[in-house]
Curated annotation (Swiss-Prot):
Sequence ranges of Basic residues compositional bias: 1-10
Per UniProt, location of the Glycyl lysine isopeptide (Lys-Gly) (interchain with G-Cter in ubiquitin) cross-link in this chain: 486
Function: Maintains chromatin CpG methylation that plays a role in genomic imprinting, regulation of embryogenesis and seed viability. Required for proper patterns of CG DNA methylation in dividing cells. Required during the endosperm development in seeds.
Pfam families on file: BAH, DNA_methylase, DNMT1-RFD
Protein's GO biological process: DNA methylation-dependent constitutive heterochromatin formation; embryo development ending in seed dormancy; methylation
Catalyzed reactions per annotation: a 2'-deoxycytidine in DNA + S-adenosyl-L-methionine = a 5-methyl-2'-deoxycytidine in DNA + S-adenosyl-L-homocysteine + H(+)
Name of this protein: DNA (cytosine-5)-methyltransferase 3
Annotated organism of origin: Arabidopsis thaliana
Phenotype on disruption: Endosperm development arrested.
Subcellular location, record wording: Nucleus
Occurrences of domain SAM-dependent MTase C5-type (ranges): 969-1402
Residue intervals passing through the bilayer: none
Region listing for Disordered, in residue ranges: 1-35
Active-site residue list: 1085
Length: 1404
């Protein structure tokens, strides 16, 4: 009880409560009938004043309460009710104690806030009393659960923040209870969780700086001063005001909350339970078989300001039950947030919905924390979920009926019911053949069907007679009507500033089609979403629709975090080492069998041991427990066992990681383990047991598919049977998981479980430690650093920042000018190695390196850089003394006569030439004198020799290693576009694109023009896959039966019909399994692109599903190599599930898989273009490495989140240096002739390479106003709409317009719309190439640096790295689309070179 401000509190209601009541009568006060001044009950107040308005009469009855003429000094206040679980607030005067119940309206807000503080105290007390060893996270979750549903809080996240913010208050209240506690009871004051809560509260108050009022912490008093009542009155009042401010912020947070679903109707018709009981099992209780965890413990509480932004997670093995543990149906819960819901009954489920695409249907439910996609229910709950699925299938059947009807208005409610009666019994939507039974089922389950149809984007379906008729029938059946909560509108000042408001999405003629898949792909993705299995595929919804056409675009992020130091490549690691829990139990441990040999330390090796009666073998798997409570036990593969010199029996093993702990996450098979390179040595006595474990090895090839499918089916059935019998899991391992390399690799079987004392992981670690050392040899003429040997005379790279003169200030950064000022590596030659007697301060080595600097043309001037070759360097007499850590690698400097005269391919070799001398003292540049002795690099690779001029004097181009077409990989390019990916791969000398599939006619024509020997199929890839399967079925049925392909293709009726229409000649040219070596392509990425406004549309969702078709091609043909390209956000789209399932699918096929993110601008193009890639290679092939980025480019380094705090970066960021400078706008387009806005003349004069005519140097025509704006934009770097003069102009039609765009002038919330109507900088880079350039579009910086026009098609093509000889097809819009959708050929070339290296390694 708190007697004075600052003193400890006591229990006010205890076993002596009756005595206290006799001593001091307690009365209930009611402040509802008199006006009072604003009251604040806090530690500051000791008296309460009330305005005297009414006097207590003698005839007032005590039980009705009294109204006071005056109210004396308040001595103290108290919180009681801890035993009852409901707080009671008391205030005391000298005369009596008062139970505070209903406050006045004016005081209600303040009192409610204080009452919630008291509730939090009671709930924390209750939870700690029953479970004092709980964790802070579990305590917060329990309190949030108990306090959820109160009107003052908008979500669980707000409750959690409130409880934490009141941590010190709660601690003080509960610590006061210790005075009356018994000796055997746990003291609150020492409770570690309560102390942690208090400490968290202090951290929040310390950081509470976003309000106008802040307490001066220098004046906070000590606890002794508080006990003496010495706290300053103003300080108390300041604390109170700060708390009020916090309360108001919670109020604002609550008011901003908006519903996710806009209600098309005013009412939600609730299902009548009695009507649907017939379709469900008999009532039963939920049986808990496994430990359950509160979602608030697993995930951080969120505010749910907009439920559309909630994360989406997947639930498996789930059940739905009420507070009485009775199983209930989802139909009892509303599909919309409603006002009349019994929140206590419904618990945390706010709403549920049905989401459907062209392939699958999902059932989702929402809590405050997340959306949950419902996977397979528990075995007990499955009968309760089946009616929901059946109703959904009926809904899809009705939707198909409506869409197939020419005029929906003709199809009445009765007509639909009659058609449902006429369905076959084997139809998934079959109910009965009796009209009465069908109508009853449709009406009583009508809310699901009604919601399913009204969510359809087709307005005709929403208003069709069946929908209105069904709603009417449901109301006539006396279902309950709930009022739907209205969607709260966010405050919007002024006019709508959305640039795309009022602009309807453009309509494409493309039709959506359900993906054609193989059964393996259908099973993997179907099991994850757990609605339809391979044996029960989703029925076709389909009818033709018009869909939104969207762009693949990725805008440069101006707010990316700037790194200040150079970071390492590969993986950012979390602390993954876990302490193994030892065993104190005595057990018998002995070796079995003979000694197999000795370790390198002379310790005897054994192949088998008995530990507590359990046999352990080399090559088996064991379980180890960790000290962290709640952590899953670890599984280790036994490499060898030995007895140490101190007679301890030990084993050395490698970690076998569960799939869920890898990048696969929830997409992994729970039985599959992955070998890793994490190893340890542990005593046998600490082993907790063994597991059933198999190293799974299978032959590779399409011809083994039937055998593997049958084996997998039996394996899954056996696993389900063991799971049902609660038997231990039987694990298997097929791959090595290496997060450091970002992939899954074939197992090193020749090095595994030999029992010889050798561990490949230990060897890798030793090599890495050796590489990290810097050593000087005895002769002091060479040294080793990062695994590279350097000698006197070598040409090397040096990090730019080590030279003081290169640390100049960069120009101001503007959009697409972020590369300006970035420096490439400095080329140097080692002259001498200087031995130091002792390391200098700040150096870690005892020697330094003397180097000669070679200058680059860009060190002289920008003009010199543009006019010179990017591989040219200048000799100088400048020398420097550098520490060895400044050296970044080796390069070569050659004579100019040994270099090619011109290049067609991007630079992938560290080679330079020098024939000029630069004097840095006066900036003079001259021919290199013959008397200067320069030892050039020796030519080791014949391909780098300069091609001799022919008799006509024309120069030949540098060509990569020529590989005969017959020895190249026979390639199928899917989603081929105009052929950028195929072009680069072919130029690398590794690929021969024999087949290509492209849906759009103009892009397909462009592909044919540039790849005349390729067979191009202009059709939907789903149809082509179906045809390939049919062709083999008709011509080689025996082969298909042998390979298990007879029923392997799952496709829609539409795809099957279109497959029959393909020309027979083209059908005969389709490849067969075994003929395709390499599949490459970039599935449509509209649904993944983060700047796609319409990514939730039907067309975009369908395009996302093309991943399934693409993977099915790989499964059907089983090529040696597979390459997937997509936008960067592919790895994070849909919470990463799509990316995880893609990798899981390839692993299930037996492939090795590697993934990474690359910046195309670092490979020789003049634009930022971040792309995700997934390589897959057959188990007996070598996975390609990622190509080294060669050009400076300002990017932060892109990392893929793995698991357990790990992040993987495929390559190192080049913002701090690279072998070559970035490619500028001037490099890319500076030599093109000037043209006018709207230029349409296709052919121009001779340009680059051996071209005699320049094509496609044409640009879009702007309207009159935009052309005027373009002319008014200054021709200076970074100029955009903000530089326009504020004036009006008369247009030719007589209309007067303001030159400054009105919307942009008011758009303060969009970073000023930087770059719109922007002019490019000669020294910067071009914007990301998109399919539709507009000055007011998503990428608005599209004006030529010197000319008043939008950049041309050819200029865009050059920014992508296409040569001038490359042709495009169609109109100007088609050509822009082809360029914008293409993979940059230089990046494809770099990937192809690495694939070529992998093939070379495979053949060694």
């Amino acid at each position: 009880m708190k007697t004075k401000a600052g003193k400890q509190k006591k229990r006010s209601v205890d076993s002596d409560d009756d005595v206290s009541r006799e001593r001091r009568p307690k009365r209930a006060t009611s402040g509802t009938n008199f006006k009072e001044k604003s009251l604040r009950f806090s530690e500051k107040y000791e008296t309460v004043e009330a305005k005297k308005e009414q006097i207590v009469g003698d005839d007032e009855k005590e039980e009705k309460g009294v109204r006071f003429q005056s109210f004396g000094r308040v001595e103290n206040w108290t919180i009681s009710g801890y035993e009852d679980g409901s707080p009671v607030i008391w205030i005391s005067t000298v005369i009596a104690d008062y139970d505070c119940r209903k406050p006045s309206k004016k005081y209600k807000k303040l009192y409610d806030y204080f009452f919630e503080k008291a509730c939090a105290c009671v709930e924390v007390c209750k939870n700690l009393s029953t479970n004092p060893d709980t964790s802070l996270k579990e305590l917060l979750a329990a309190v949030v659960r108990s306090m959820n549903g109160r009107k003052i809080f908008s979500s669980g996240g707000v409750i959690q923040e409130f409880v934490i913010s009141q941590g010190e208050f709660i601690y003080n209240q509960l610590a006061g209870l210790d005075e009356t506690s018994k000796n055997h009871e746990t003291k609150f004051v020492d409770n570690r969780v309560l102390v942690s809560l208090r400490d968290e509260s202090r951290k929040i108050h310390k950081a509470f700086s976003n309000v106008a009022l802040r307490i001066d912490e220098s004046k906070v008093l000590t606890s002794d001063q508080l006990m003496d009542g010495g706290e300053d009155e103003d300080l108390k009042y300041a604390k109170l005001l700060q708390e009020e401010e916090h309360m108001k912020s919670m109020d604002r947070s609550r008011n901003k909350r908006s519903s996710t679903t806009s209600a098309p109707n005013k009412f939600y018709i609730k299902i009548n339970e009695d009507e649907i009981a017939h379709d469900y099992p008999l009532p039963s209780y939920y049986k808990n078989t496994k430990d359950e965890t509160d979602e608030l413990v697993l995930f951080n509480a969120g505010y749910a300001v907009d439920a559309r932004n909630l994360p989406c997670r997947t639930l498996h093995n789930w059940a739905l039950y009420n507070s009485d543990l009775m199983l209930i149906s989802l139909e009892f819960l509303p599909m919309k947030p409603c006002a009349d819901i019994d929140v206590t009954y419904l618990g945390q489920i706010k709403e549920w919905k049905i989401d459907f695409g062209e392939d699958m249907i999902f059932v989702l439910l929402r809590t405050d924390m997340a959306w949950y996609r419902l996977g397979k229910p528990s075995e007990q709950y499955a009968p309760w979920f089946e009616p929901i699925l059946k109703t959904v299938r009926i809904g899809t059947s009705i939707l198909a009926l409506l869409k197939n009807e020419t005029r929906m208005a003709k199809l009445s409610y009765t007509d639909v019911i009659k058609r449902l009666c006429g369905l076959e019994e084997n139809d998934q939507a079959y109910i009965s053949s009796t009209f009465f039974d069908v109508e009853r089922y449709v009406i009583v389950h009508g809310q699901i069907i009604l919601q399913f149809l009204t969510e359809c984007p087709d307005e005709y379906i929403k208003r069709c007679p069946f929908v209105t008729g069904l709603a009417s029938k449901m109301q006539d059946r006396h279902h309950t009507k709930w009022i739907i909560k209205k969607k709260r509108k966010m405050l919007q000042k002024g006019e709508n500033l959305n640039l795309r408001r009022g602009k309807a999405p453009k309509v494409s003629k493309m039709k959506a089609m359900q993906a054609t898949t193989t059964r393996l792909i259908n099973r993997i993705w179907g099991e994850f979403y757990s609605i339809y299995s391979p044996e029960d595929p989703l029925e076709e919804i389909g009818a033709e629709e018009e869909f939104e056409e969207v762009e693949d675009v990725e805008e440069e992020d101006e707010n990316e975090e700037e790194d200040t130091i150079q970071k390492a490549i590969e993986v950012q690691k979390a602390d993954t080492l876990k302490k193994i829990r030892g065993s104190c139990k005595e057990m018998e441990i002995r070796w079995e069998g003979e000694i197999l040999g000795e370790t390198c330390a002379g310790e005897p090796l054994y192949g088998q041991a008995l530990v507590g009666g359990r046999k352990m073998d080399v090559g088996g798997a064991v379980i180890l427990e960790v000290d962290d409570q709640g952590e899953t036990p670890l599984i280790y593969f036994v490499e060898y066992m030995f007895e140490s010199s101190d007679n301890s029996k030990k084993l050395h093993g490698k970690l076998l990681q569960r799939g869920s702990e890898t990048v696969l996450g929830t997409a992994a098979n729970e039985r599959e383990l992955f070998l890793t390179n994490e190893c340890l040595t542990v005593q046998l006595k600490d082993i907790k047991g063994t597991v059933s474990f198999e190293i799974r090895s299978r032959p590779w090839g399409h011809q083994y598919k039937k055998e593997h499918m049958a084996a997998d089916k039996l394996d899954r059935a056996r696993a389900e049977e063991r799971k049902a019998k609660d038997l231990p899991i039987e694990y298997y391992c097929k791959s090595l998981y290496s997060p450091e390399k970002g992939g899954f690799f074939s197992l090193p079987r020749s090095d595994m479980g030999l029992g010889s004392g050798f561990c490949s992981s230990c060897k890798i670690r030793e090599n890495e430690e050796e590489r990290s050392k810097t050593k000087l040899n005895d002769s002091k003429t060479r040294f080793l650093s990062n695994g590279i040997k350097y000698s006197v005379g070598d040409f090397v790279y040096q990090i730019p920042n080590y030279l003081s003169k290169d640390r100049g200030k960069r120009r101001p950064v503007f959009k697409y000018g972020r590369n300006v000022g970035l420096r490439a590596f400095v080329v140097c030659q080692i002259l001498d190695i200087v031995d130091l007697k002792e390391p200098k301060k700040g150096n870690t080595t005892s020697f330094e390196v003397k180097v000669r600097r070679f200058y680059r043309p860009d060190d002289v001037s920008a003009e010199e850089a543009y006019a010179s070759d990017i591989q040219e360097v200048y000799y100088s007499e400048d020398t420097y003394i550098l520490p060895p850590e400044a050296i970044k690698g080796k390069c070569e400097v050659m004579k100019k006569t040994d270099m090619p005269l011109c290049r067609e391919y991007p630079i992938l070799d560290h080679v330079y030439f020098c024939d000029r001398f630069y004097d840095s003292s006066n900036g003079c540049l001259k021919k290199l004198p013959y008397n200067m002795m320069l030892k050039f690099s020796t030519i080791k690779d014949d391909t780098l020799l300069r091609e001799k001029k022919t008799e006509t004097g024309s120069a030949m181009l540098l060509k990569p290693d020529e590989v005969p077409k017959g020895k190249r990989l026979a390639t199928l390019d899917i989603f081929a576009g105009c052929g950028g990916l195929s072009y680069g791969l072919e130029k690398a000398g590794v690929s021969d694109t024999k087949w290509a599939i492209e849906y759009e006619e103009p892009a397909a024509q462009a592909f044919k023009q540039n790849h005349p020997k390729t067979t191009v199929f202009v059709d939907n890839c789903n149809v082509i896959l179906r045809i390939s399967w049919l062709r083999l079925l008709i011509n080689d049925r025996a082969i298909m039966e042998k390979c298990g392909d007879v029923d392997d293709c799952i496709s829609t009726t539409e795809a099957a019909e279109l497959a029959t229409k393909l020309d027979e000649n083209q059908k005969s040219t389709l490849p067969l399994p075994g003929q395709v070596d390499f599949i490459s392509g970039g599935p449509p990425c509209q649904g993944f692109s983060r700047l796609n406004r319409f990514s939730d549309g039907s067309w975009s969702k369908n395009q996302c599903q093309m991943i399934l078709a693409f993977l099915s091609f790989a499964d059907y043909f089983r090529p040696k190599y597979f390459l997937l390209e997509n936008v960067k956000t592919f790895v994070s789209f849909n919470e990463g599930h799509t990316f995880h399932l893609t990798v899981a699918s390839l692993l299930e096929m037996g492939y090795q898989v590697r993934f990474g993110l690359l910046e195309a601008g670092a490979y020789g193009i003049s634009q930022p273009r971040k792309r995700a890639f997934i390589w897959a290679a057959a188990p007996n092939e070598v996975l390609p490495e990622w190509p080294e980025p060669m050009h400076v480019f300002n990017n932060p380094g892109f990392k893929i989140p793995l698991s357990q705090g790990l992040h993987y970066a495929a390559v190192q960021s080049t913002k701090f240096g690279a072998p070559f400078r970035s490619i500028t706008v001037r490099d890319a387009i500076g030599d093109l002739p000037p043209i006018e806005s709207g230029e349409s003349k296709i052919n121009k004069e001779e340009m680059r390479g051996s071209m005699t005519v320049l094509t496609d140097h044409i640009c879009k025509k702007m309207n009159e106003l935009n052309l005027i704006r373009c002319k008014k934009i200054p021709k200076t770097p970074g100029a955009d709409w903000r530089d326009l003069p504020d004036e009006h102009v008369n247009l030719s039609n007589g209309i007067v317009k303001n030159i400054v765009p009105n919307l942009l002038n008011k758009a303060k919330d969009h970073n000023g719309y930087k770059g719109l109507y922007g002019r490019l900088d000669w020294h910067g880079n071009l914007p990301t190439c998109i399919t539709n350039l507009q000055p007011m579009g998503l990428v608005g910086m599209c004006f030529h640096p010197d000319q008043d026009r939008i950049i041309s098609v050819r200029e865009c093509a050059r920014s992508q790295g296409f040569p001038d000889s490359y042709k495009f097809s169609g109109n100007i819009k088609d050509k822009h689309r082809q360029v914008g959708n293409a993979v940059p050929p230089p990046l494809a070339f770099a990937l192809g070179r690495k694939l070529k290296e992998a093939l070379h390694l495979r053949n060694i």
